[in-house]
């Protein structure tokens, strides 16, 4: 019984020591590289950009969609790059074809992996695109985004989004 208790105490002690060492070493490595840690508020603000992008697209709300992006943002997907606010706005006009309101799709995101960088933050995030006009709703596309984020006077914004679609090839 004493051996079990001693083993338990050693394990708890090591866990406590490692919890103190790891964050400090992470901070010092980041500080040496000029990278600031992200706060919980930063994480939430970055995740909100996904909601702005998704709901702006799903409800054909151009201004909401554009509010996720920096003025000089680039979106890379099949077919090439869309550059800047004017390019993003023109792409939305082309896609919406003058229609407004619910498009009958829902973008769903998950597995957010957000990390600080010297210039802001980056993330890889999975997405599913669902058709909700049929019953049951079904997945019509899936993939992931690789994003670079910058902090602006208006808060966090997407600087560069690369969209990768899952394929069966």
Predicted regions and their residues:
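Positively charged n-region of N-terminal signal peptides that target proteins for export
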Residues: 1-4
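Short, surface-exposed coil-to-beta transition loops
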Residues: 107-109, 140-145
């Amino acid at each position: 019984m004493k051996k079990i208790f001693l083993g338990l105490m050693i394990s708890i002690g090591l866990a406590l020591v490692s919890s103190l060492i790891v964050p400090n070493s992470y901070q010092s490595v980041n500080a040496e590289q000029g990278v600031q840690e992200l706060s919980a508020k930063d994480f939430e603000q970055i995740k909100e950009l996904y909601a702005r992008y998704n709901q702006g697209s799903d409800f054909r709300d151009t201004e909401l969609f554009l509010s996720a992006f920096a003025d000089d943002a680039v979106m890379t997907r099949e077919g090439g790059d869309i550059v800047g606010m004017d390019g993003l706005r023109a792409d939305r006009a082309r896609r919406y074809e003058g229609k407004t309101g619910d498009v009958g799709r829902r973008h769903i995101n998950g597995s957010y992996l957000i990390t600080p960088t010297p210039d802001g933050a980056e993330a890889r995030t999975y997405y599913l695109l669902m058709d909700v006009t049929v019953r049951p709703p079904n997945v019509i596309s899936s993939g992931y985004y690789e994003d670079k984020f910058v902090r602006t006077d208006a808060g966090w914004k997407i600087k560069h989004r690369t969209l990768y679609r899952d394929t069966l090839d």
